[in-house]
């Protein structure tokens, strides 16, 4: 009797130990992508090891293109570097949320350190969440979200050199363009040469096939801008002639475009309704005027008639007096403005001016506590870039 009772108890224990396996229906791939696309990049890097399916989805071009859609939430970065000491730099980041001030202007606060120890040097360009920067002749590409860095082959030319970085949407490739040039004592460019590198395994520099007028960058550390797979950058052919160069990232063809303004000082190039435009702000500090011409035909160097935008009276106190630094924004029809010099322990403020709506669309602030040694002198910084990424 006792032995049979023990057997019965053991059977019940074994039954309890049995695990119930429930087979759940598989999540459709499109639904899985919709879920994963909402996650930050750091989480996606970890989730690649969940399964082979997740790895293939996260690393696919389709997923990457959806992840970097302009409409997706973006984070604002600021990159500061000292021209005299390229190892002295800061990479700062805004929090994900923004607030509104009393005038209903969106306010973003750059309040987080994202500095990566082995970075440094000048920022070349930011494209679809990746940063390209250089120190000397070393060019590197960094993903600030995953903190991964790739160093490109060293450029061996002994002449002057500068770079640009962009994304070719037709072939879904990232390319780095290098320009080498030689000038006379009169600053006339006698020779220039371009090389291009496609980012990937075994990447190497090669000469471009397209011929072009010898030129050099408009000024040192000159950044370009990309619209629909075409890279645009300012250039000089001699001391008295400035032009706009275009480089098709797919066909790798160059085009020289004459500028619409005879006086090209204090001009920037920007995205205006999907077209490249030249913005001249010579009269901004005195009168609040910004003049814009839009490129209509690149082959004929044909521009639209000049259109003048007038800054709101409420913002004239900001632009009046001290020298302004004006830069292009990723957003169409908007420019970034900041003071060239700031006082110690003062917030670094940037304004995103929407020319179409004639209003300050966004205010960007950098907390003084993040600036460290950059805040020890009245000369706030030598080079400052702000850019958006996923």
Curated annotation (Swiss-Prot):
Name used for this protein in its record: Putative F-box protein At3g52320
One of the Pfam families matching this protein, by short name: FBA_3
Disulfide-linked positions: none
Top-level taxon of the source organism: Eukaryota
Domain F-box intervals: 21-71
PANTHER family: BNAA05G37150D PROTEIN-RELATED, F-BOX ASSOCIATED UBIQUITINATION EFFECTOR FAMILY PROTEIN
């Amino acid at each position: 009797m006792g032995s049979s009772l023990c057997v019965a108890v053991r059977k019940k224990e074994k039954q309890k130990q049995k695990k119930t396996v429930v087979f759940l229906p598989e999540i459709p791939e499109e639904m899985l992508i919709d879920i994963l696309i909402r996650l930050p990049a750091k989480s996606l890097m970890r989730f690649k090891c969940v399964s082979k399916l997740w790895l293939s989805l996260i690393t696919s071009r389709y997923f990457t293109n959806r992840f970097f859609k302009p409409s997706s939430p973006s984070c604002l970065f600021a990159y500061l570097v000292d021209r005299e000491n390229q190892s002295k730099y800061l990479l700062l980041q805004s929090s994900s949320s923004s607030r509104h001030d009393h005038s209903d202007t969106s306010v973003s606060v750059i309040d987080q350190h994202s500095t990566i120890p082995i970075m440094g040097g000048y920022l070349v360009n930011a494209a679809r969440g990746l940063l390209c920067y250089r120190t000397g002749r070393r060019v590197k590409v960094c993903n600030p979200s995953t903190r991964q860095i790739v160093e490109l082959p060293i450029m061996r030319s002994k002449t002057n050199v500068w770079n640009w970085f962009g994304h070719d949407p037709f072939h879904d490739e990232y390319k780095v363009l290098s320009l080498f040039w030689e000038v006379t004592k009169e600053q006339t460019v006698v020779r220039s040469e371009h090389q291009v590198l496609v980012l990937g395994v075994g990447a190497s520099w090669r000469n471009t096939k397209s011929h072009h007028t010898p030129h050099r960058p408009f000024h040192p550390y000159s950044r370009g801008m990309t619209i629909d797979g075409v890279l645009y950058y300012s250039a000089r052919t001699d001391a008295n002639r400035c032009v706009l160069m275009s480089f098709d990232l797919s066909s790798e063809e160059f085009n020289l475009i004459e500028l619409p303004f005879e006086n090209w000082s204090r001009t920037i190039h920007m995205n205006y309704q999907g077209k490249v435009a030249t913005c001249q702000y010579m009269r901004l500090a005195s009168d609040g005027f910004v003049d814009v011409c839009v490129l209509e035909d690149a082959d004929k160097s044909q521009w639209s008639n000049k259109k003048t935008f007038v800054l709101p009276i409420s913002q004239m106190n900001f632009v009046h007096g001290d020298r302004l630094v004006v830069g292009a924004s990723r957003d169409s029809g908007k420019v970034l403005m900041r003071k060239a010099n700031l006082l110690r322990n003062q917030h670094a403020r940037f304004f995103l001016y929407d020319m179409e709506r004639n209003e300050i669309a966004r205010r960007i602030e950098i907390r003084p506590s993040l600036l460290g040694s950059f805040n020890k002198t009245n000369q706030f910084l030598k080079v400052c870039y702000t850019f958006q990424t996923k």
